[in-house]
Amino acid sequence: KVSVLAPDRNWSASGHVKTLHRPLRVKEVQLADGTPALASDGAPSDCVALAVLGILPEPIDLVVSGINPNANVGHDVTYSGTVTAAMEGAIWGLPSLAFSLDRNEENNHTLHYETAAAVAARLVPMVIQNGLPPHVLLNVNIPNQPLSALRGWMVTRLGLRIYRDELIRREDPRGKPYYWIGGDEPTGLPEEGTDIGALAGNYVSVTPVQLDLTAYQALDGLRGWQFPDLNSHKESSNPP
């Protein structure tokens, strides 16, 4: 059985949200094909938490987030509401996957959701059968092409995203400034073995992402630092 609990609006670039400052609303809706679903005014990660905490009456076996209409590659995973919803599932100990379509200026005329759905339908049973390591999710990016045009699967690492953000300053009718973060669409380095490289080669990219963000290679170096005595300033600031 597939149960749907999703945001009622766009949460692009929302990151990992946990709404604690206001109540969350959930309402029954119908999808375009008549499928019953639940919609919430919370973020994608809120929706996963709501489902796990009891909005859905049955135990949850697996979390699927997406299909996002833009790729989530490289550093995008820290911004993405789609990926962080899967992260929320992994926090709860559930096998979790995020699916995104690689729409860009060259292929944005048609969104091939049917391709991404076919990819998800093939991958989800494999995750159910094989499982995932604890606190690991799969970030899946699919070329925005017909299924017949895809060259296959590629297990990848996160690539290097290149952002082209710029500050756009405007003034309201009262002369007060306001700002947009604008700029051109991000690009990336299509290096071999990366999610960006896989998409450039028309492969489905499957990237295991872990919740542990510790930079283990930096630990020994940091342990060699001579950290100052935390009490030295306090003692020197006391009057005689």
Write out the residue ranges for each language-model feature.
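Electrostatically charged, flexible surface regions
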Residues: 111-240
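Short beta-strand segments
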Residues: 6, 65-68, 98-100, 139-143, ...
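Alpha-helix C-terminal capping segments
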Residues: 51-57, 84-95
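Glycine/threonine-rich flexible loop motifs
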Residues: 71-80
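Glycine-rich phosphate/pyrophosphate-binding loops
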Residues: 90-115
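Short glycine-rich anion-binding loops that position phosphate/pyrophosphate groups of nucleotides
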Residues: 10, 43-44, 68-71, 145, ...
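A cross-family phosphate/adenosyl-ligand binding-site feature
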Residues: 3-53, 58-59
